[in-house]
UniProtKB/Swiss-Prot annotation:
Subunit and partners: The complex is composed of two ATP-binding proteins (OsmV), two transmembrane proteins (OsmW and OsmY) and a solute-binding protein (OsmX).
UniProt-annotated binding residues for ATP: 39-46
Enzyme Commission number(s) of this protein: 7.6.2.-
Lineage of source species: Bacteria, Pseudomonadati, Pseudomonadota, Gammaproteobacteria, Enterobacterales
GO process terms (BP): glycine betaine transport
Source superkingdom: Bacteria
Statement: the UniProt record of this protein carries the keyword Repeat: yes
Name of protein: Osmoprotectant import ATP-binding protein OsmV
Organism: Salmonella typhimurium (strain LT2 / SGSC1412 / ATCC 700720)
Family of the protein in this entry: Belongs to the ABC transporter superfamily.
């Protein structure tokens, strides 16, 4: 865990005037989570990051890593236990890729075989052929490949904490997305505590478990990506995340988040049509989903067809043209609804059981209601 307590950094300008680059910042990043420090240039993000591994000394306040105050730690030992990734990559041009990756492990006394094995493991994580690249030098690799090496080098000694200062900023958009996706896959497996600096709202929304928005050295809001978009704290945050923030939420909210807010109303194949009609009439719905004994959707019965009809639901059940998964984001769901020219569809869990229904109206209601997918226990500045 990373904990910042009243962290402040004050510089003296050329004319002798004091300037608070970081002003009384309080922030908790739980173990295994990624927090993105987001804001415009000069707002204190990078200064905050550099104080964590003591590249810059704080003017006041405390930094705790897993409960230990960094002021009480040897600076060299501290840095060897923190992975650090910068935009400029910083690979050593006179070292091979293997030597670059294993700089810190070799400092820690790892033997050659262990270093090589670790380098091969990390190369595999970013889809680079170890046999092809480990003996090469940085100049023999593309910019995107070098950036991958910069990321895995920071992970070589398996540090619990990773600091990243705009790590993907110098890469072209196509490579950036690939590297971001690879890094997310690694993070899901490794569960490092990560603090990442960015000025890109889309990158922050994609990568962060939580986002701390900086302005003039202070945190003005710290929230989950979905909450940040749904409930910006003030006009500055709202303008920074963009006027299309509701559309951005489509990528963050899952179908299951929406169906969890809706009543689950179903019938069985053997349910009398008169009973099914009564249920639909009571809840003012135009159709009811029919499920089997395992809870899997078989189709639906229309209210107008069940009115005054005899028999059971199985007699007039219409099969579904499409179904969605609970983990699908709303962008995928909307796309499938539009492609199929239908207004609603059933959502199923990983075992294929009925989870509820989702419609264009439900999605609009959810996004406009201000509800968020989860609440985080976040300590932010007042």
């Amino acid at each position: 865990m990373i904990k910042l307590e009243n962290l402040t950094k004050q510089f003296v300008q050329k004319k002798g005037q004091p300037l608070k680059a970081v002003d009384n910042v309080n922030l908790n990043v739980p173990e295994g989570e990624m927090c993105v420090l987001l804001g415009p240039s000069g707002c204190g993000k990078t200064t905050t990051l550099k104080m964590i591994n003591r590249l810059i000394a704080p003017s006041s306040g405390n930094i705790l890593i897993n409960g230990e105050n960094t002021n009480d730690m040897d600076a060299v030992t501290l840095r060897r236990n923190i992975g650090y990734v910068i935009q400029q990559i910083g690979l050593f041009p006179n070292m091979t890729i293997e030597e670059n990756i294993t700089v810190v492990p070799r400092m820690l006394g790892w033997d050659k075989a262990r270093c090589k094995q670790r380098a091969e493991e990390l190369m595999d994580m970013v889809a680079l052929d170890a046999r092809k690249f480990l003996h090469r030098y940085p100049k023999e690799m593309s910019g995107g490949q070098q950036q991958r090496i910069g990321v895995i080098r920071a992970l070589a000694a398996d540090p619990p904490v990773l600091l990243m200062d705009e790590p993907f900023g110098a890469v072209d958009p196509i490579n950036r997305e690939v590297i971001q996706n690879q890094f997310l896959d690694m993070q899901r497996k490794l569960k490092k505590t990560v603090m990442l600096v960015s000025h890109d709202i889309d990158e922050a929304l994609k990568l962060g478990d939580r986002i701390a928005v900086f302005r003039q050295g202070r945190i003005v809001q710290c929230a989950s990506p979905d909450e940040l978009l749904a409930k910006p704290a003030n006009e500055f945050v709202g303008s920074f995340v963009g006027q299309d923030r509701t559309l951005k939420r489509l990528l963050l909210v899952s179908a299951g988040d929406v169906t969890d807010q809706q009543p689950t109303i179903t019938a069985r194949p053997s349910t009398p049509l008169s009973e099914a009609f009564g249920i639909m009439d009571d809840h003012d719905i135009r159709a009811i989903t029919v499920i089997d004994n395992d809870g899997k959707p078989l189709g639906f019965v229309k209210r107008r067809e069940a009115r005054n009809a005899s028999g059971i639901c199985a007699d007039i059940t219409h099969p579904f043209r499409i179904t969605g998964k609970a983990e699908d984001n709303l962008r995928i769901v909307l796309s499938r609804l539009y492609e199929s020219n239908t207004s609603w569809m059933p959502i199923v869990d990983e075992d294929g059981r009925y989870n509820g229904e989702i419609s264009q109206d439900y999605i609009a209601d959810y996004l406009s209601s201000g509800r968020t997918r989860r609440a985080l226990n976040i300590h932010e500045n007042s």
